[in-house]
Amino acid sequence: MNSQILYEDNHIIIINKKVGQLVQGDKTGDHSLLELLKDFIKERDQKPGNVYLGLVHRIDRPTSGLVIYAKTSKALSRLTQMVKNREIKKTYWAVVPKEMIPQSQTLTHYLKKNEKNNKAIIYSHETEGAKKAILSYNIIKTLDNYILLEVDLQTGRHHQIRAQLSKIGIPIKGDLKYGAPRSNPDGGISLHARMLEFIHPVSKELIKITAPVPQNDAIWKACEM
């Protein structure tokens, strides 16, 4: 667990989540990163009582990268409000098929969550019940069969990056749910929460964190070189 902790102080802890880890418990009953962290902190710090830890924001189970947890209720309250106010800048890396697309582009669509299959339905125009979704991307590396996109989110919708990139014909590598032709060996998708930038909720210092990509994947390693 130590190697996954990229930043920690008395108020927050930032983790580099592995593919397949749940950020918090769900109906599967699988052990989550939240529970693992609580157990780790309790043992490391020799805490006699319960460890307080609150999830600030989610990333999908098949993705990897940065997740913020709050260690106090005050920090959780402030950070949750910052997420709502778009005061936490999130940058993602996505590996997609090598197709002829613009070097950079802003995408605007409308997304509605299908609760039955946990998938986003995407529309090109305003639709009742659908929420506006905006992202911008820039191609930062070209490989033999893939390209690496740096993606900045302007909104935070369910499966937003996955759905919007699929809509323009470039589903994320390994993302069978949104049209990728085959799965990744680790069962995940090649979407990585790469960078976070925000003002610390208590100290007011600027926090900038970058998460290394999964090291067990040759494509990811080539992207980071």
Predicted regions: what is each one?
Residues 1-225:
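RNA pseudouridine synthases
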